[in-house]
Amino acid sequence: MLTDEYRYKILNVLQQDPNISQRELAKRLGVSLGKTNFCLRSLIEKGLIKAENFKNNSNKVKYLYLLTPKGIEEKISLTQCFLKRKLKEHEELEKEIERLRKEVSDTK
């Protein structure tokens, strides 16, 4: 299953580096090549990315992964969700830090 986290990470990497290989993408994500292939196929089926063939310098056929307009909208939506979640985590962490500081100062 393709989680929001992986969907976000993949869309983000592909937007920055559309000619990345599946092997390099798998390495950046810290997942297997098979899982990366599965995720890319899923994103293509959902219309979030498209893959185009091109030849690189050594005459090997490679893919160029491009975000579709729908993919760009999805990335924006996911970014907003992650930002909201991270801000909440940040607030909770600040509260915990303050509680720990108070605990330490109370024991002195």
Stretches found by the model and what they are:
Residues 23, 34, 38:
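Key DNA-contact positions within bacterial/archaeal DNA-binding proteins
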Residues 27, 45:
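Alpha-helical residues within the helix-turn-helix
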Residues 14-17:
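Short helix-capping/hinge SLiMs at alpha-helix to coil transitions
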Residues 1-6, 21, 52-75:
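Short, cationic-aromatic polyanion-contact patches
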Residues 73-108:
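Amphipathic alpha-helical dimerization/coiled-coil segments
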Residues 8-12:
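Pre-recognition alpha-helix immediately N-terminal to the DNA-recognition helix
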